[in-house]
């Protein structure tokens, strides 16, 4: 397996995948410009044992929450992509449950949302609107993953060569015994794999029919509150085995009739069986703040107007996945008024001008406009 992963063809194909969308970056340009020579050098280094994993750089991510991630050298990204695509991913995901929805080919947020609606409709046809939702969110999932647990999972599910190469990369890039910073595909695979035994436990031991896990977010639908409390308690016990704990604010049991929030959308099941799926209010608020900053930059000539439209169209495409017609109409009107200057005029504050250094000004016009919408 090692010979296949480090072969010229495998590494070259991995380079072609890794460069998509990032060829404008200088390190990528430099590597790809002499791609054949660099790939051949990598191949020989793996053959004669002189290959060394590079040191990643820490970068700060601020949205949707502040956290640290790792930026990996391009040559290491090529090598890791070859491991993932040719061996690690196929072997690790082979035993996943259908309801494990994150970071897999043919799956993702859209798949998970569709599965939620499918489960809700199936449940409604059997039991109506009476039911209970169990939601569990793990606090600091990546930062609290034990290295020994991840390596044990890889060792149990993959061949010897894949285990040695994968664990070697993780050990070189992450010091200590606990915690991984997101930023590489290999860490994502570790994230979706670590709790695979818990997925099977929920399905096969607790006999839960309607359950979904998206990375560290659990969504479970059961018939009675007693069942919900039992499932919730068992999940808490299982998480302790992995040294993980639930986020108290985001982990709870709620009646199905009250609705719930999952993956950025609010869901509500009506008495007639209709599933109402609306965009989370936090997303709308964030979009409005972003539009204020971008429009002001555009008015100062620092940003092309087309970039504002491109950003907003992307947000609308996501909103279209739910019942968001009225929200879209209000946001479009808000954007038009921003461009006309009816709400803000020349008044700008630090948050509106992306840190331009100006002092804060009264926001009465802005508050009045938001009240109207």
Predicted segments, located by residue:
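PAPS/PAP-binding and catalytic site of the sulfotransferase fold
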Residues: 83-86, 235, 239
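Conserved polymerase palm-domain catalytic core
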Residues: 45, 114-215, 219-238, 254
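Surface-exposed helix-capping loop/turn segments at secondary-structure junctions
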Residues: 93-94, 204-210, 243-247
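Right-hand nucleic-acid polymerase module
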Residues: 72-73, 77, 81, 172-176, ...
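Beta-rich nucleic-acid/ligand-interaction surfaces
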Residues: 102-111, 219-221, 253-259
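Conserved two-metal-ion catalytic palm core of "right-hand" nucleic acid polymerases
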Residues: 1-150, 158, 170-174, 365, ...
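Short Gly/Ser/Thr- and Asp/Glu-enriched loop/turn motifs at secondary-structure junctions
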Residues: 56, 212-216, 248-249
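Short, residue-level hotspots on alpha-helical faces of the histone-fold
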Residues: 81, 85, 192-197, 250
């Amino acid at each position: 397996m090692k010979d296949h992963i480090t072969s010229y063809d495998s590494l070259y194909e991995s380079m072609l995948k890794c460069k998509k969308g990032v060829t404008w970056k200088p390190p990528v340009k430099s590597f790809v410009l002499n791609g054949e020579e660099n790939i051949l050098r990598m191949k020989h280094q793996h053959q004669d044992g002189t290959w060394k994993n590079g040191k990643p750089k820490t970068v700060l991510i601020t949205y949707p929450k502040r956290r640290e991630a790792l930026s990996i050298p391009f040559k290491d990204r090529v090598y890791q992509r070859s491991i993932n695509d040719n061996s690690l991913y196929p072997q690790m995901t082979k035993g996943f449950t259908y309801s494990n929805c994150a970071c897999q080919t043919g799956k993702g947020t859209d798949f998970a949302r569709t599965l939620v609606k499918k489960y809700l409709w199936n449940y409604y046809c059997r039991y109506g609107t009476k039911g209970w939702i169990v939601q569990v969110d793990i606090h600091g999932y990546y930062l609290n993953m034990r290295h020994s647990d991840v390596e044990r999972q890889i060792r149990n599910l993959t061949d010897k060569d894949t285990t040695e190469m994968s664990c070697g990369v993780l050990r070189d890039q992450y010091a200590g015994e606990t915690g991984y910073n997101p930023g590489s595909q290999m860490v994502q695979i570790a994230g979706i794999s670590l709790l695979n035994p818990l997925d099977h436990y929920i399905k096969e031991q607790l006999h839960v029919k309607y359950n979904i896990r998206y990375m560290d977010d659990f969504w479970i639908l059961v018939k009675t509150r007693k069942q919900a409390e039992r499932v919730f308690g068992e999940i808490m016990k299982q998480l302790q085995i992995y040294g993980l704990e639930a986020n108290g604010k985001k982990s709870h049991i709620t009646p199905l009739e009250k609705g719930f929030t999952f993956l950025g959308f609010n869901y509500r099941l009506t008495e007639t069986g209709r599933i109402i799926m609306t965009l989370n209010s936090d997303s709308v608020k964030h979009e409005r703040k972003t539009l204020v900053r971008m429009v002001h930059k555009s008015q100062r000539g620092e940003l092309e107007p087309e970039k504002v439209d491109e950003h907003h169209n992307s947000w609308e495409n996501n909103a279209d996945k739910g019942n968001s017609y009225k929200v879209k109409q209000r946001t479009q009107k808000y954007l038009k008024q921003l461009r006309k200057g009816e709400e803000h005029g020349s008044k700008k504050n630090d948050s509106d001008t992306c840190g331009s250094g100006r002092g804060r000004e009264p926001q009465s016009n802005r508050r009045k406009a938001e009240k109207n919408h």
